[in-house]
């Protein structure tokens, strides 16, 4: 099954190279960016009839952000002490503990991060007794 081309058009685009286009377009094919550029006088070119189009007029379009140090899912939102697995205190040194065992994948922090533009995160434990 052939996937349709996806076009995000009309939004203010921040590029990885530092260029900013007040009105631009992004063409995505098979999940990868194929082309992007500024829009001049409307659409970037005649769009394919079967293309999926997202009108981003008035919106900011930018690459996903990377959170390089966080405790998302380990220090859970709205859980208080019960949801805080950041620092384990059962022993003075706990090399046998892994942060992946403490992560709650349905923690609201992940949704909040996505809404803020974070698409990748390096999640680690606390440093109190590692």
Kindly label every feature range from the protein language model.
Residues 7-8, 27, 67, 92:
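Conserved beta-strand segments that form the floor/walls of ligand-binding pockets within enzyme
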Residues 2-5, 13-62:
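Histidine-rich, glycine-flanked metal-binding segment
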Residues 1-11, 87-90:
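Short, positively charged
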Residues 8, 52-54, 66, 122:
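Hydrophobic/aromatic beta-strand patches that form the interior of the parallel beta-sheet core
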Residues 59-127:
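Metal-associated gating/positioning segment near the N- to mid-region
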């Amino acid at each position: 099954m052939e996937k349709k081309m996806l076009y995000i058009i009309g939004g203010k685009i921040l590029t990885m190279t530092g260029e900013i286009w007040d009105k631009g377009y992004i063409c995505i094919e098979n999940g990868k960016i194929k082309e992007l550029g500024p829009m001049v006088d409307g659409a970037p070119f005649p769009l394919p009839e079967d293309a999926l189009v997202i009108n981003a007029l008035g919106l900011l379009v930018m690459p996903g952000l990377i959170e390089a140090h966080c405790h998302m899912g380990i220090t859970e939102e709205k859980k208080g002490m019960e949801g805080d697995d950041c620092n384990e205190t059962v022993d003075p040194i706990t090399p046998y503990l892994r942060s992946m065992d403490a992560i709650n994948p349905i923690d609201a922090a992940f949704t909040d991060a996505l809404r803020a533009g974070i698409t990748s995160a390096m999640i680690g434990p606390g440093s109190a007794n590692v």
